[in-house]
């Protein structure tokens, strides 16, 4: 497995997100209840960065059309989104946050 360091834990507070690059792939990194999760960075419905969306109750709302995704599973929760997000494995070692390379899947 190819793990890529993308951030330090202190960079994100709970219910915050940021876009990171993992070997040229845009990935949205989320912190929920002191756990880290990663999905593809773009909404599956339209060209919008999910890291700019509203994060609440383990879901992210697309900033463009308000479609919602479950951050933990990538599941599309409501219209207009119908296609699930791809999720990425995340691990934390001390303060360092790693995401598995999308190419490693």
Where would I find each of the regions flagged by the language model?
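Rieske [2Fe-2S] iron-sulfur-binding domain
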Residues: 11-105
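Short amphipathic
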Residues: 2-8
């Amino acid at each position: 497995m190819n793990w890529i360091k993308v951030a330090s834990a202190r960079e994100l507070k709970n219910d915050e997100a940021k876009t990171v690059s993992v070997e040229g792939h845009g990935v949205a990194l989320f912190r929920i209840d002191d756990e880290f999760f990663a999905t593809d960075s773009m909404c599956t419905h339209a060209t919008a960065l999910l890291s700019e969306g509203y994060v609440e109750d383990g879901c992210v709302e697309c900033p463009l059309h308000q479609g919602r995704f479950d951050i933990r599973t990538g599941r599309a929760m409501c219209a207009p989104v119908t296609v699930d997000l791809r999720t990425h494995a995340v691990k934390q070692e001390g303060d360092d946050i790693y995401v598995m390379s999308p190419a490693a899947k």
